[in-house]
Every structure is written in structure tokens, then in C-alpha cells.
Amino acid sequence: MKLKSLIVGALAIAAAAACSKKPAELAQGPWLGVLVVDSTEQGMEVPFNMNVYKTAAGLDSVEIVNAGEKIAITEITRSGDTLTMQLPVFTSEIVAVVGADSLKGCYYPKGKENGTCYKFYAVKGITDRFPAATEAATANIQGRWEVIENPGTPDSTVMVGEFKQEGAKVTGTWLNTGGDMRYLEGKISGNKLMLSAVDGAHTLIMTGEVTADGKIANGKFMGSPKWKSVWTAVKNDNANLPTVESLIHLKKGPKTFQFACVNLKGDTVKLSDNQFKGKVVIVTASGSWCPNCMDETRFFSELYTKYNAKGLEIVALCFEGKDLESSKKAMERFAKQTGANYTFLYAGPRGKETKDKVLYNLEGQVAFPTSIFINRKGEIVKLHTGFSGPGTGEHYTQLVEETTALVEKLLKE
């Protein structure tokens, strides 16, 4: 649904406010934000909910809400009418002119320094994520679905959709072999499905139509101007993804692993260093740009805090920009904002060539993140590719329980 027409009046007010001598206050309460990720895609603007409030110190604070997730933006600066909001964990930021009850500006998915701008609009007082879709829901998609992305093409992929529906409101996620799409929220209007998410890494919009025979057809997906697909889905309570064991395995040869990468100080760190000898080590292929890596890092941070004194070490091999200098700031921010105190190393530029070189003895799907579990003898005992985060509910709970049990078992050996 095209949302721009709903906020034209509010933006006119913003222009008038900009002409006044006193900068407009950022109004407290609920807001609806909209990102125009690709202006050539009509009806695919990406809406998201925001709440604005004052902290105890009287400072502006903004909260982005996607289904069960609340993302607090506390790094906010103001220069005249211009507001800059740095989203947590990642390098994305919003720069907008403040009107009486509106905002207008840019969402920079990789930070203002990168220069890529998605047009950003927001208006106060709207809580409906898709307010132009007013028809009562005539379909219910509660449950599990088998999702086919790009059906009938060489790029065809099977995923699992899990949704909850209350009235017209729909929440849920898509699970795939690399992880999940995190927290999706939207609605059904008539038979039309609309879902979106904005979390600092993702800018997602999904649409589709529930057919008379209960399928979902004419699905469209967009995550960026270059990340687009079509999809269909059928209800399937038994829909499942391939097992991790079928996706990734070790090449023939020694069941060991070695790395030599630089830390944030530029010093070379090796798995053969004394720091890791006789320890249980988790090595994870990660990246400061990766939302599923963020979810894994937060969990691994808890594991490290609980078990480091008992002999657990965790190393994140980060695949980033062209060199450490250009990647250091994002890596430091990622580690700090996820609360991770374990070892972060620069593994090289993001890309298949570097990944294949660093993770030299892994075969199959090596997604971000991919984790290697190593016992006290230095032997690889388990590989895990992808990460199903907290947005997947019971899948996340099961993964946390299984991983924790494995770590405890290895520490006792």
C-alpha cells in the first residue's frame, strides 16, 4: 500500500515549522515511519512503528517497535531543525527535519558517510502500520507455511513461514537455512497480506494475496533495491528446513581448525596461542552488518559470561570491509552494543573468496553466522550454520538449550 499520500499534509506542516525561528519540538507519542527503499517499486514502501518519549533527564528517546521487539534509539543529536538518530548495534542512521508533527529526511542503511539514502517520512499519531489498508480481514494465516521463493527458477528456495494472527494483525517470521527474517509485523486487509520490519539492518516489506483455496499467491519481497524476490506459500503444519548436518560438513582430513587473524589493535591472534590451549573454543564466522549474527552474539555473550571461568573461549572471525582500518569502528560498535567481551578478529573483506580461504576445511552452506565447536583437545566436534534468533520463538529456545548443553558437556570432558 502506498503510504506517502497519507502524510503530505503533515509534511506541509513540517515545511511551515522549518520557517519559524524556534525549532519544532519532537512530539512525544506514537509515530508511523515510512522508508522509500526503491521508488520504482510502487506499493512497496516500508512502514514501521515508533514511539517518542522523554528520558528522566529530559532527553529525547525513540523506540522502534517490530512485533515483540523494541529497539531503543538513545544516540540522538539535534542541530536546529535537523535530527540525527543513530540506530543501535549497526551503522545505520536517520537524518530528518523536524516539523510540528512530522519528520522528513533520509535513512542511511550503512551510515551517512556511505551516502546511500532511502527517503524517510514519519507522521505522529498513527499506530496502524498499513493505514491505507482499511478493508476487514477475510483470511486467517495463523500457523506454519511452506514458502517457495522465486518458484520455478534456478534461484528457487524453500523457507518456513510461521505466523500469528489476531483480528487483522499479523506477526511472525520466515525461517531459512541461514537463520530468520527476525520480527515481522503487519496485517491482512481483505485477502491481502502486508508485513514489514525495520531494525537497523533489515528494511523488509512482504506482500501477498490469500487465495480462495487457502494458499498465498502473488507474493513480493524486498529488502533493498538489489534484494528482491517473488514468492508463494502453502499451509503445511509439517513444513521443515533441512537439518544442519545435511547443510555443512568438514572436508576429508584432520578434524582440526586453525586461524591467524588480527585483533582490533592490529596484533595477530592464532588458535594455537596459549589463550586457547586446553580450552573449549567456539569460533564463529560473523559480521557487524549481519542481523542473525547480532542475535547469535547476544546469546554467545551470555554463554561467555557464564562459562569463561570454567574454560570457554569464543572467537568471532569478522568478515567486513577492505581492511581493518575501514572496519574497526563498525566492529567495535557491534561488540560494545551486543555486550560481547570475547575475542573479535578481522578475518578479511566480506565475500566468498575470503570466506573460503579462512574457513578452509568447511564444505556446504557456510552462512553468516557459522559456528565451529572445538573441544579441549583441539578437535572439531560440531558445526552449525545459520542462527534462529528470538523472533523464531520455540526454535530459538531449542537452539539455546542444545548449545548450552553441548558447551557444558565439553567443559566436563
Features from the language model and the residues they span:
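Short active-site neighborhood of thiol/selenol oxidoreductases, capturing the structured segment around
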Residues: 269-294, 300
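Structural microenvironment flanking redox-active thiols in thiol-disulfide oxidoreductases
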Residues: 295-339, 350-359
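Surface-exposed beta-loop interaction hotspot
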Residues: 116-149, 244-250, 256-258
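Central antiparallel beta-sheet cores of small beta-barrel/beta-sandwich binding domains
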Residues: 25-98, 130-133, 139-211
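Bacterial Sec-dependent N-terminal signal peptides
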Residues: 1-30
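N-proximal helix/coil linker or "cap" segments that precede and/or mark the start of modular domains
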Residues: 222-262, 274-278
